[in-house]
Amino acid sequence: SKRIAEAIRSQVSLLAASPVFSEGTSVNYEAAANDAAKVLDRIGGVNGMSATGNNWFAQTTEIDNLRSGAVPQEILWRGSRTNGAEDWNLGLNQEADNFPPTLYGRGRINPTQNLVEAFPTSTGYPITDSRSAYDVDHPYANRDPRLDMYIIHDGSRYKGKEIKTDITTTGNDDGLNKISTSTRTGYYMKKLLREDCDPNPNSQNAKYHYPVYIRYTEIFLNYAEAANEAWGPKGSGSHAYSAYDVIKAIRDRAGITDVA
């Protein structure tokens, strides 16, 4: 459809505007920002940002009731919804591959410490900033809410139980390097998984999933990057919103306290 083509153009324009690729092309960051804005203006700009776009995969009722050809507010382009087992993205294969061992998963994708440390505190400051109030003795407390939304860490509660991943854990296969399917980093993947799926071979429960090709949040971030390069953080060209406005809206949606 037209909106998908416009979204792909936005992706390509941002890459083409980069100094790495811009030689021999007339595309610049202003053009890339305009291409992204064309997509976003169709949903009302920043006001059209989905309130649940940061955890679309957890909107289980919405996914289960999704009609053929329909898309949730966050999703610009998606594949077919199914609960079949023939695709890694579908049925309960993602959950079987990535749940911790005590939840009958294979623990394959393990987020890194670098990724965990990239999440700021709930005030928006990096954990290395003295203003962040980061507590090294309680490293997961008062963090960006998206950390708990996307990553299972030591002490996380998931599917009604506490997950223990620390190296001293005994009698628990979720601990660091305990068995071949245990985490190698101290973390397990949570993003994209449905908590109501059950890979237990004695009580398997598959749920509907659908692959996502383009989310509106991606286009918002495309705009923010290009607009910042073209007009600065609070410039907006001919549009009603700036890079600052977009990033603030995304952080507000996540529950990060406004610090500026």
Task: Cite the ranges covered by each PLM segment.
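Acidic/polar-rich alpha-helix caps and helix-coil junctions
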Residues: 1-95, 101-113, 117-260
